[in-house]
Regions:
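N-terminal glycine/serine-rich phosphate-binding loop of ATP-dependent small-molecule kinases
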Residues: 1-97
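Conserved small/polar residues in nucleotide/adenosyl-binding loops
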Residues: 101-103
């Protein structure tokens, strides 16, 4: 059975998952863009639900690909939007507003 690593890159314009061999060779990439909102000049916002949806989609894509290659994913690494802020409602678990990217 082949063994793989996965990197999830949740960036400011898209979510991407990359399937790597153990030697670090990229085997397969899935990428999905999401909507950018510009409420004011110089501001950028994202919908947290859309971010989560795109991450789930690209991760599912690489999992399916690894199974087609008769492989097993050993580990997952994650990178994200360092500067992004999301406020969550403690009781509902839902976001209060769109995520704030650049102000």
């Amino acid at each position: 059975m082949k063994k793989f690593l996965v990197a999830i890159d949740q960036g400011t314009t898209s979510s991407r998952a990359i399937l790597f061999s153990l030697s670090g060779k990229p085997i397969y990439t899935s990428q999905k863009e999401f909507t950018q909102y510009f409420p004011k000049d110089g501001w950028v916002e994202h919908n947290p639900n859309e971010i989560w949806s795109t991450v789930r989609k690209v991760l599912t894509d690489v999992i399916v690909k690894s199974k087609k290659l008769k492989g097993k994913i050993l580990t997952i690494g994650i990178t994200n939007q360092r500067e992004t802020t999301i406020l969550w409602d403690k009781k509902s678990g839902k976001h209060v507003y769109l995520s704030l990217i650049h102000i």
